[in-house]
């Protein structure tokens, strides 16, 4: 039996501390959609998505109402399009191949809108060791695809611990991000584009979600959200030692994750598809108090970004994993604390106060999930500098055998001190300064940075 205190605690978490299910994401395998005819490919993709995920929104809302727990977004991820587009464009010139990729993106967008989901991920390519013609066409189509769609998210994996860093792909992505910024209002397309090292195959969070080739035909993955709950827990621990803080965070993470497991399994059962994983990531929102930065400040930092921030984030990340792992049958995805600047009111304040820089954020990514996220930079930033920022973050992931990523937004016409307003979960992004010294010669060398010695595990 539950006692009254536990019931009141749960109500408080939901009503006042922003506890919710951030994402219910159906992963769909599109390998059986492959065709040499682009029209047939698009038809197959559309039909498969509608068949597998057509009732996701209705089912999620029914379960949400049953338990009184908000499910914020309903999403779909698909097999990386770069892996299935090749047959349809193998005999086409590059420009025609690019246009075909855009048509597939528009098919994904139409399917997403017709089944009323929020986002669809998987306009992706895995190019950590090299690029096929289809993958190159897909990458080069991203700016136009973002212009023509509103729900499609794109992710490109350019590095891994086993393969090293594909510097040619890193250079290309700097150019693509720069171009995407000019094709969409306030560079919004860049907010739906992420560059990965060691990308997971079962990630429920956008913009990096795709359905890995090792996955089954369909699966439901869940991402929880509870920074406000963790912050409230830490706020009650005045003058307690750090071990006590860690232990209380673990207990809270356990409760949050159990909720995610419960909701995820029920939605999956009602949809008649297998349940996959719970992603243990703490995902902030722009709402007051629902902030990773605020948790770190409750732990004892005057402002997120000051000395000690990396240590505080490391203990938070570890405690969340330990508590969450006990509560879930299967853990996957990114599973760590997210630090997206524009989506976290505490991070925005830290940037405005001069406490938080891109360099400090890079250090923080060494101990958490997932990377340099939702960072707006001056529109004049050269593509080579964006590529170099990506290369640095990929190196952290490659060497430390972890997932890292970059979602950076060069906003045309904006400079340091300006803001760009996206609204909703994407929030408000202050324009952050980048190092003005050039990395162009390094990026132009091209080739592949070899895998580190720690990749040799056998």
Swiss-Prot record:
**Which superkingdom does the taxonomy of this entry point to?**
Archaea
Report the SUPFAM superfamilies cross-referenced here. PFL-like glycyl radical enzymes (SSF51998)
- CDD domains, per the entry: RNR_PFL_like_DUF711
**Which family is it part of?**
Belongs to the UPF0210 family.
UniProt-recorded name of the protein: UPF0210 protein Maeo_1412
Species whose genome carries this gene: Methanococcus aeolicus (strain ATCC BAA-1280 / DSM 17508 / OCM 812 / Nankai-3)
| Lineage, broadest ranks | Archaea, Methanobacteriati, Methanobacteriota, Methanomada group, Methanococci
């Amino acid at each position: 039996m539950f006692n009254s205190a536990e019931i009141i605690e749960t109500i408080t978490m939901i009503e006042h501390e922003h506890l919710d299910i951030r994402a219910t994401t159906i992963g769909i395998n599109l390998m059986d959609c492959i065709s040499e005819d682009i029209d047939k490919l698009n038809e197959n993709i559309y039909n498969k998505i509608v068949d597998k995920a057509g009732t996701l929104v209705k089912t999620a809302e029914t379960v949400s109402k049953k338990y009184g727990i908000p499910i914020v977004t309903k999403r779909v991820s698909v097999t990386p399009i770069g892996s299935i587009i090749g047959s349809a464009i193998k005999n086409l010139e590059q420009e025609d191949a690019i246009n075909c990729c855009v048509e597939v993106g528009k098919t994904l967008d139409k399917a997403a809108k017709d089944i009323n989901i929020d986002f669809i991920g998987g306009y992706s390519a895995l190019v950590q060791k090299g690029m096929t013609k289809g993958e190159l066409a897909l990458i080069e189509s991203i700016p136009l695809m973002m212009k023509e769609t509103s729900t499609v998210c794109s992710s490109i994996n350019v590095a891994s611990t086993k393969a090293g860093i594909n510097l040619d792909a890193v250079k290309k992505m700097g150019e693509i991000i720069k171009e995407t910024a000019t094709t969409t209002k306030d560079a919004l397309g860049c907010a739906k584009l992420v560059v990965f090292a060691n990308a997971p195959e079962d990630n429920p969070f956008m913009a990096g979600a795709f359905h890995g080739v090792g996955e089954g035909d369909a699966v439901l993955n869940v991402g929880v959200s509870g920074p406000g709950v963790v912050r409230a827990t830490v706020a009650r621990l005045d003058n307690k030692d750090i071990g006590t803080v860690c232990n209380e965070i673990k207990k809270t993470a356990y409760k949050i994750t159990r909720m995610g497991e419960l909701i995820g399994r029920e939605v999956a059962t009602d949809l008649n598809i297998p349940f996959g994983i719970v992603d243990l990531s703490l995902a902030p929102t722009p709402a007051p108090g629902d902030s990773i930065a605020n948790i770190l400040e409750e732990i004892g930092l005057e402002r997120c970004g000051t000395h000690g921030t990396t240590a505080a984030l490391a203990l938070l990340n570890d405690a969340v994993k330990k508590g969450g792992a006990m509560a879930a049958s299967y853990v996957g995805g990114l599973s760590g604390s997210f630090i997206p600047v524009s989506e976290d009111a505490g991070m925005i304040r830290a940037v405005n106060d001069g406490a938080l820089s891109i360099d400090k954020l890079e250090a923080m990514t060494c101990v958490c999930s997932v990377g340099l996220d939702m960072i707006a930079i001056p529109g004049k930033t050269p593509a080579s500098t964006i590529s170099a920022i990506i290369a640095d973050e990929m190196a952290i992931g490659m060497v430390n055998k972890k997932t890292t990523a970059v979602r950076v937004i060069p906003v045309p016409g904006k400079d340091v001190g300006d803001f760009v307003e996206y609204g909703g979960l994407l929030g408000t992004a202050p324009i952050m300064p980048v190092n003005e010294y050039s990395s162009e010669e390094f990026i132009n060398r091209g080739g592949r940075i070899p895998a580190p010695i720690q990749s040799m595990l056998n």
